[in-house]
Each structure stands twice: as structure tokens, then as C-alpha cells.
Amino acid sequence: MKNSSKYACPMSDITINQHYVWQHYLRAWTNSKKLWCKRVDNPEPFNTSPRNIGAQRFFYEFQQLSWGDITYLKALISRASSPRLRELNQGWIDSAQMSFEVRRKLNSIDIKPQHREELEKDLRKIEKTLGESLHGATEELAIPILAKLREEDAAFYQNVETRNDFINFISHQYFRTAKMRNIITAIRNPLPHDIARTWPIEAFIYATNLASSLVGEGRKRRIIFLRNASAVPFITGDQPVINLLGANEEEVDLYYPLKSDLAIIFTANQLSFPSDHIDIGAIEVESYNHRIYAMSDSQIYGDDPAYLKVLAKLPKENLF
């Protein structure tokens, strides 16, 4: 498992529209570089580029933490029994607060106004873009892995390094989203903190905790390929990785659609999934699609607008 805080962050440009659903991933549903999106606030699906969806303005921006925020995050980190895991998670806090510490030290130094202004611009770039760049570093490692998965090839999982890259990637894809932020926001916590300030760091902490647990299970886990043998396409959404056992469960069977005719389940459940390749029909595809829809925050995506429109009319409660 890698702590992506070691990766350099290019600061030549500021990315305003920051994606919590990977654009490269969504391209599998595109035709002529566009896919269909059904938003909760729009009655009709619309055809658009992946760059225009699954994103919010400065979604990953780091802010200066208050004493209460730090106390809350340290309490969260302290739950881990592993000293190494606590160290990794402390690294996320340190990385997120690095620019504010630099700014504090600069305030006590006599610097020419024009140089101070340039330094301030650089620090603001770091605060606004470092989070997305860290996620981008994880995704970069996953590009060849995703390509293999879409070929129904999981041989990479037998190699420790690429197995851990996959686990790290899917853990971050699970926790990095607006939906997971909103779920955590709804949970009451006795420690006073501002979720707007803590969440961009919490997402890394939760993902690191999950990845550590999954790495520990090693070869007990398998990648199950679900082949869509029906005319009903797999969809995806703005929460593209879901836990089939429930969002509030500690145990996870992670479902991840890869394209309209292929999805995977990452599981340790040999009894429920005895085969690594399973052909499924329309009813099962509908069930998985409804789960993606039910866990979506505000958007679902696919290559069939009529199907998305019909699906979005259903209640989000479990129908299967």
C-alpha cells in the first residue's frame, strides 16, 4: 500500500472543476467522446463529456484546521491499532497543513512585498490543488490495471506491488466522492469540528484504513468478473464503487462497473462467488444498476439515455 503524499504536485495551473469520479474511467461509456448523464435535478438525460460531470468547484481544497478539527482527526487516527497506519494517516494531516505552516513561518520573515505576493500565490495553488493531485497520482498507477480488468485479466493481482496498487486505488475511489462526504457529514460526532475543513483529509484517512485492511487479507480476496449477457447495460454513477454489504458495514464486497457489459466484485466470499467469471442476465444486471442508482449522490451515467430515465424514476429503496 502506497501513501500517495510522496508524489509531487504540479502547480503550473489551478484546476477549478475537481473530479471525484475519474474521467478516464468514465470514457468506457462514451460514444464520440460523450456519455449520457441523468441528474436528479434534471428530468431529461443529457449528452456530455466526462470532464463536465462528477465534479465540484475546488472539491479537494485543503483549509487551515482549527484546534477542534485537529483534535477530531487525531481521535480518528488513534483508532488504528497499527503504529504504521497511524503514522501514514498523520502524514495526510501534515501534508494538508504544510502550506499553512510555511505561511506562518514566512510571516515572521522580512520579505519584499512582490516576493511575498508570489509566495502567497504558490501557497494558495498548493491548498487548492494538492488534494486532487494526490488522487491523480493514485489513478495514474491504476491506468494499466483498469485496462487489464476490462480485458477480464486479473493476473496482476498475483503480484504484490500491483495488487496493492489496485487495492489502494479502489479504496480511494470508494471514499473520495461527494456521496461519502455527505454520509459522513450526517453522522453526529461529540468532538466539535468543521466537516468542510476535515473531510478532504478524512477521505484519505478512511481510504488508507480500508486499503490497509484489504492488503492484510491478501490472497483471501479475489476479483470476480460479472459478464453482462443481457441487453440491459451496466451503468455507473457519481459513487462508482459501492459496498454490496451496505455503506455502514465494516466488511466489504466492493462492486465496480467497468463498462456496459462488464463489472467486478472484489470479495473474500468464496461461498457466494465460487467462480472468477460469472455470466449474469437482465434481472441481476438490473439489481446491480439499482444499487448504483440508490447509492448515487445526484448523477448516474451510461450509454442508454432511455434506460437512465426509467431507472431514475424508481425509488432508491432496495427493490431486489
Stretches with model-predicted labels:
Residues 2-17, 21-320:
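Alpha-helical structural context detector biased toward long hydrophobic helices
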